[in-house]
């Protein structure tokens, strides 16, 4: 049990969440559960293993068997790349969902980004010149609801990732925090594309003031080649199971995914630890697929604070983050209120002038209207539409991974707004530098 579990501030917090009804991201929390890190920084976790992020781009028709160490007899370069993309995705989960437990002692409530907040950096990969430079751009494109859009790209190896994320949280009667994720990520590797959906999750350990994340439900990785990976998450039960468990199956296409016996490969283990893979119809023993403990994360290179723009996360939240590290509740309240009041005044000024905040590098596209209706709409060959169709994924703003016809997809009045990176806007950027 955490040393904070019996504190009066924690008891008050538990009482407030028990009766809370609304967006939990706006709920105040005691200082010891606050993180000094903004949600805009979470985008970096997608590429903290550059060698795995870029590996699919090095696989071609001539070398795919030698690159696929887990199966030297892999049937095609497309399948070798899908295995590499799956390994990359699994490698992102530890950073995304349990790195704060290791560095901060338990899961913390991140800072709520303000509209227009930015976080940028790069992986220079100096020890691996063949990797080239990988760039991260993250922007808070909406505050109500809170939405973070991001792009990670490596021009040398023609790898591009873009996506956006939004969460909605609620408490169960047992005070377990359930989190629905919204949004998706798209990965382009030269001529192939992959659509990735994040899983739902829940946070346990709240009653004892020692929160930790457990993933649940499913994630999908849909390839433009037709290949599909379905990842099912489970946690430790009262009587059995291990924490952070998953089972992933790779299929020839979404039709085959209806029958688990048709899986080409099955991968199982712990996403925060090790996992093994076995090939269909093979009597050989399973092989090691990935071990999170063996490959340390490579952290993003972010320029010094004095060189950052006022909109950049670490500069904007510097005083608040410092107060959180000190555990000074009064100073946290003072510095946080000052920043938030400044942002409210900006919104009031914009409203008075009849203008709205201009997003810097991302634009929202409406997938529910036609070009004649005057909105920004996707093109006919839109990658997301193609991949969503192959997966039978809902294009509405339903929880990530919602399939067409699911309960969430059938809800009325759902919009279909999705955020897309505009590379030309970054190329024209004058104020923000890496």
Curated annotation (Swiss-Prot):
Q: Which domain of life is it from?
A: Eukaryota
- Where does it reside? Cytoplasm; Golgi apparatus membrane
GO MF annotation list: lipid binding; oxysterol binding; phosphatidic acid binding; phosphatidylinositol-4,5-bisphosphate binding; phosphatidylinositol-4-phosphate binding; sterol transfer activity
Keyword Phosphoprotein assigned? yes
Keywords, A to Z? Cytoplasm, Golgi apparatus, Lipid transport, Lipid-binding, Membrane, Phosphoprotein, Transport
User: Which InterPro entries does the protein's record reference?
Assistant: OSBP_sf (IPR037239), Oxysterol-bd (IPR000648), Oxysterol-bd_CS (IPR018494)
GO CC: one term?
A: Golgi membrane
Q: Where does cholesterol bind?
A: 96
Q: Where does 25-hydroxycholesterol bind?
A: 96
Chain sites annotated for binding a 1,2-diacyl-sn-glycero-3-phospho-(1D-myo-inositol 4-phosphate): 24-29, 109-112, 143-144, 336, 340, 344
> What are the start and end residues of every segment in region (ALPS motif)?
7-29
- Does this UniProt record's set of keywords contain Magnesium? no
Binding positions for 20-hydroxycholesterol per the UniProt entry: 96
Gene Ontology process terms (BP): endocytosis; ER to Golgi ceramide transport; exocytosis; maintenance of cell polarity; piecemeal microautophagy of the nucleus; post-Golgi vesicle-mediated transport; sphingolipid metabolic process; sterol transport
What does the annotation give as the result of altering residue 344 to A?
A: Slight reduction in cholesterol transport. Abolishes binding to phosphatidylinositol 4-phosphate
Other remarks in the entry:
Present with 32200 molecules/cell in log phase SD medium.
In the record, the note on similarity to other proteins reads: Belongs to the OSBP family.
| Function in brief | Lipid transport protein (LTP) involved in non-vesicular transfer of lipids between membranes. Functions in phosphoinositide-coupled directional transport of various lipids by carrying the lipid molecule in a hydrophobic pocket and transferring it between membranes through the cytosol. Involved in maintenance of intracellular sterol distribution and homeostasis. Involved in lipid countertransport between the Golgi complex and membranes of the endoplasmic reticulum.
Protein name stated in the entry: Oxysterol-binding protein homolog 4
What is the native source organism of this protein? Saccharomyces cerevisiae (strain ATCC 204508 / S288c) (Baker's yeast)
Gene coding for it:
KES1
């Amino acid at each position: 049990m955490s040393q904070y579990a019996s504190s009066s501030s924690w008891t008050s917090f538990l009482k407030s969440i028990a009766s809370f009804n609304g967006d939990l991201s706006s709920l105040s929390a005691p200082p010891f559960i606050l993180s000094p890190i903004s949600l805009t920084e979470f985008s970096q976790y997608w590429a903290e293993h550059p060698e795995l992020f870029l590996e699919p781009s090095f696989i071609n028709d001539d070398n795919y068997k030698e690159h696929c160490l887990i199966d030297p007899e892999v049937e095609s370069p497309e399948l070798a790349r899908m295995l590499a993309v799956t390994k990359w995705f699994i490698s992102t989960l530890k950073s995304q969902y349990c790195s704060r437990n290791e560095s901060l002692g338990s899961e913390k409530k991140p800072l709520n980004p303000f509209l227009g907040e930015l976080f940028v950096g790069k992986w220079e990969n100096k020890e691996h010149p063949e990797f080239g430079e990988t760039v991260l751009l993250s922007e808070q494109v909406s505050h109500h609801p809170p939405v973070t859009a991001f792009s990670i790209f490596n021009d040398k190896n023609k790898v591009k990732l873009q996506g956006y994320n939004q969460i909605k949280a609620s408490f169960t009667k047992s005070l377990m925090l359930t989190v629905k994720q919204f949004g998706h990520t798209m990965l382009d590797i030269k001529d192939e594309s992959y659509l990735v959906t994040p899983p739902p999750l829940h946070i346990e350990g709240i009653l004892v003031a020692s929160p930790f994340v457990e993933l649940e439900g499913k994630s999908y990785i849909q390839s433009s080649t037709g290949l599909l990976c379905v990842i099912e998450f489970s946690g430790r039960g009262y009587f059995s199971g291990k924490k952070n468990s998953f089972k992933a199956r790779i299929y020839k296409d979404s039709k085959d995914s209806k029958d688990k016996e048709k899986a080409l490969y099955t991968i199982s283990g712990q996403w925060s630890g090790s996992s093994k893979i076995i090939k269909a119809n093979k009597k050989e023993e399973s092989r090691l697929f990935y071990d999170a403990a063996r490959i340390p994360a490579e952290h993003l290179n972010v320029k010094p604070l004095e060189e950052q723009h006022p909109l950049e996360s670490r500069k904007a939240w510097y005083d608040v983050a410092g107060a959180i590290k000190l555990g000074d509740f009064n100073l946290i309240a003072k510095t946080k209120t000052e920043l938030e009041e400044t942002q409210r005044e900006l919104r009031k000024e914009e409203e008075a002038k009849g203008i709205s905040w201009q997003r810097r590098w991302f634009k929202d596209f409406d997938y529910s209207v036609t070009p004649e209706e005057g909105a920004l709409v996707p093109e006919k060959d839109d990658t997301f539409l193609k991949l969503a169709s192959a997966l039978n994924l809902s294009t509405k703003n339903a929880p990530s991974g919602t399939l067409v016809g699911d309960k969430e997809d059938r809800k009325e009045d759902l919009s279909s707004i999705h955020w897309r990176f505009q590379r030309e806007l970054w190329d024209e950027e004058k104020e923000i530098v890496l």
